[in-house]
């Protein structure tokens, strides 16, 4: 007979479970000594707040307490005034939950926990208090005290006893992101593999692997941005580097469209000239050498100045018999994007050094305000649908409760509110709700054992610890494993929630079964209403993300076509709005990748590669906004207006093919710039770079621009701008 194999738990998992259980028992002890009516609320709170990283525990503690305070205050204000009108009270509490849920979905960071908790806390306190509104204030105060004790104990134990800092996690993700960006740049700068001049990177690279690497980089940037929300709460010196980390996120995000643009410009040069020309190959080799020396810390200012001179020389290429106007335009665009990469990489290196200094206790330098998380993709329509589903589910349970006079109908409304909120960020929350329900059903026998058998036999605190330890310690071990977190949390939530809702001294089997039926009914109602109102497929969600991108591109071009761009110098340095668009597009790429994979790797009308193209497009439109004074006014307005019209029609589903007139307008504007005498200025080169990018992104299969279209034309001279 084979030996029974027991799971092996790591030291970190054992430490996490032990700290969580110790915090739970401390909270239970303090709540009992204080005479609070439901001390198991404190126990449940310690596990809800628990996290392997101390910084995440502290931030969740702050957010949870604020949400609890807001929710309990709303309950005290609403329930007494409406206790004599149960139908109206149910509607008002449902609307409150829906409003808070909608607000929470507008913030895709852990801060959203405040609003979500404010919503369902009102349901957890308000609905059970309907039958005794005179005791509502005392009940609300008791819940805040019990939850506050749980938060305090969890924060204390996880912060003081073997605290797990966020440094390895955050810095590991940060360095992996930098390494991926550096690898991408290194791939682009590889020298030609043979005399034909064809770069080695295109000869031996797997396109699918490269595409996966690009999408992983986008996902890592967004994940880092969300995870860094916890950094100011960390227990180590890492918290002093929060500003540098946020600034570095913005810098890496801004590098991505430039990396993608360089890759496309090299491909275009190879297609136009048959191979990478010697002058371009020499520049790539010089840039690659500088990058290697910069990474090794051996680069000096002379090497950087020499590289800048080479970039300037390529950008100043004059037309001759061997270089066509299109080849010249591609060289100007390539030089401009490589210059961005060089300066951006140097900024990233400085910020990484500042972070290392901050970890040693040095005061980090003051940073320009980062973009933060406000620029992440938001789907307001889905947020409103999620709120509507929560309102309808609560009203359905409330109507059944009122019509039947069911004594435990409050449990159904509570569970409907909680489960509609928990899974609102998913495209289709129903499978997750059903999975949670399955494990909640498995928790019922354990809850019955505690409520009906074990707890009535407990006569002192030592016995309580001994009774709780086996189940809660084991579930805590599995909570520390990401693969088992959801089942363990569902079981723990089911057991501790049942204990919190019952008076364990007077509970009987009838009240227990009644309460369990109410909870199950509420979860089923949440799943039913969500499936009817809110569930969508991955393909539907991916198309919404793509249409949001097209609408934003139309707005960017339309704003430029309507009014002159008047960005302040500080705004130009921060890269607003172009850098904000880059962050949002990287977030969308990270959102699209799993949805395309979930749909079997293919969604009609949605290609993952198109997202990178749209990312470059936004950078080019933003650059053209800044330097539009370099173009004749009529030409700039007509071009940007056509681009805005095209993307608005595309977002509305009214056009699929790119109009040939748009290609003609781009070629006309590009010809005027190449034929002008002012192409030596930074703004003029930026205009050429943006126009080349628009042509390549909108018409990648179009033949090179004809030489005959390039004629000298007068172009207004503008003040020097920021080179893009």
Where are the regions a protein language model picked out?
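A transmembrane helix-and-boundary motif of multi-pass membrane transporters/channels
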Residues: 1-233, 240, 350-607, 709-724
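Helix-boundary capping/turn motifs
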Residues: 70, 95, 390-391, 613, ...
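Soluble C-terminal extramembrane regulatory/interaction domains of multi-pass membrane proteins
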Residues: 177-181, 185-202, 245-368, 553, ...
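Long, compositionally biased charged/polar accessory segments in the mid-to-C-terminal portions
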Residues: 580-628, 634-637, 643-644
């Amino acid at each position: 007979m084979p030996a029974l194999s027991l799971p092996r738990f790591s030291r970190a998992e054992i430490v996490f479970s032990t700290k969580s259980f110790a915090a739970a028992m401390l909270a239970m002890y303090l709540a009992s000594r204080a005479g609070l009516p439901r001390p198991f609320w404190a126990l449940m709170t310690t596990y809800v707040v628990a996290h392997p990283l101390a910084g995440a525990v502290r931030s969740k503690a702050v957010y949870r307490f604020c949400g609890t305070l807001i929710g309990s205050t709303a309950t005290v204000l609403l329930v007494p005034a409406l206790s004599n009108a149960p139908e109206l009270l149910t509607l008002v509490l449902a609307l409150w939950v829906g409003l808070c849920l909608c607000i929470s979905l507008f913030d895709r960071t852990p801060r959203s926990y405040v609003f979500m908790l404010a919503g369902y806390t009102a349901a957890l306190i308000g609905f059970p208090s309907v039958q005794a509104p005179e005791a509502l204030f005392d009940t609300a105060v008791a819940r805040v005290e019990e939850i506050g004790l749980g938060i305090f104990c969890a924060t204390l134990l996880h912060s003081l006893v073997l605290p797990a800092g966020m440094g390895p996690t955050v810095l590991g993700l940060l360095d992996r992101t930098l390494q991926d960006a550096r690898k991408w740049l290194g791939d682009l700068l590889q020298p030609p593999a043979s005399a034909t001049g064809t770069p080695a990177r295109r000869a031996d690279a797997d396109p699918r692997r490269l595409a996966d690497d690009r999408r992983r980089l986008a996902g890592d940037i967004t994940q880092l941005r969300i995870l860094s929300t916890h950094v100011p709460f960390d227990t180590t010196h890492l918290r002093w580097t929060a500003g540098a980390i946020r600034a570095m996120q913005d810098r890496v995000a801004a590098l991505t469209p430039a990396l993608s643009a360089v890759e496309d410009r090299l491909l275009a040069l190879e297609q136009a000239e048959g191979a990478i020309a010697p002058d371009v190959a020499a520049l790539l080799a010089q840039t690659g050498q500088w990058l290697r020396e910069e990474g090794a810390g051996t680069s000096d200012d002379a090497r950087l100045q020499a590289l800048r001179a080479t970039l300037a020389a390529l950008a100043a290429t004059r037309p001759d018999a061997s270089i066509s106007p299109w080849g010249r335009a591609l060289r100007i665009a390539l030089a401009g994007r490589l210059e961005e990469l060089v300066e951006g990489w140097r900024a990233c290196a400085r910020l990484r050094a500042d972070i290392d200094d901050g970890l040693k206790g040095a005061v980090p330098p003051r940073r320009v305000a980062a973009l933060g998380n406000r620029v992440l993709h938001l789907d307001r329509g889905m947020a409103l649908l999620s709120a509507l589903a929560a309102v309808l589910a609560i009203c359905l349970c409330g109507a059944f409760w009122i019509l039947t006079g069911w004594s435990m109908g409050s449990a159904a409304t509570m569970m409907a509110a909680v489960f509609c909120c928990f899974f609102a960020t998913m495209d289709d929350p129903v499978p997750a709700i059903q999975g949670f329900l399955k494990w909640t059903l498995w928790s019922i026998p354990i809850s019955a054992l505690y409520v009906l058998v074990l707890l009535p036999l407990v006569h002192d605190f030592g016995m309580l610890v001994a009774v709780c330890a086996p189940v809660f310690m084991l579930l805590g071990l599995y909570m520390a494993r990401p693969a088992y977190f959801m089942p363990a949390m569902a079981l723990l939530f089911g057991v501790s929630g049942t204990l919190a809702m019952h008076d364990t001294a007077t509970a009987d089997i009838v009240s227990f079964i009644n309460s369990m039926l109410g909870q199950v009914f509420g979860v089923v109602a949440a799943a039913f209403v969500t499936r009817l109102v809110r569930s969508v497929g991955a393909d539907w969600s991916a198309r919404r993300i793509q249409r949001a991108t097209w609408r934003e591109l139309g707005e960017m071009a339309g704003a430029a076509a309507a009014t002159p761009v008047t960005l302040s110098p500080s705004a130009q340095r921060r890269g607003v709005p172009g850098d904000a668009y880059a962050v949002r597009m990287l977030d969308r790429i990270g959102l699209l990748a799993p949805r395309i994979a979930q749909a079997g790797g293919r969604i009609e009308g949605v290609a993952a590669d198109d997202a990178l193209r749209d990312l470059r497009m936004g950078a080019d439109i933003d650059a053209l906004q800044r330097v539009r004074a370099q173009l004749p006014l009529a030409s700039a307005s007509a071009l940007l207006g056509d681009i805005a019209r095209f993307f608005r029609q595309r977002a509305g589903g009214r056009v699929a093919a790119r109009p040939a007139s748009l290609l003609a307008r781009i070629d006309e504007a590009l010809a005027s710039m190449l034929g002008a005498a002012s192409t030596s200025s930074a703004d003029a080169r930026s205009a050429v770079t943006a126009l080349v990018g628009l042509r390549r992104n909108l018409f990648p299969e179009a033949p090179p621009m004809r030489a005959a279209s390039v004629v000298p034309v007068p172009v207004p001279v503008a003040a020097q701008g920021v080179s893009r």
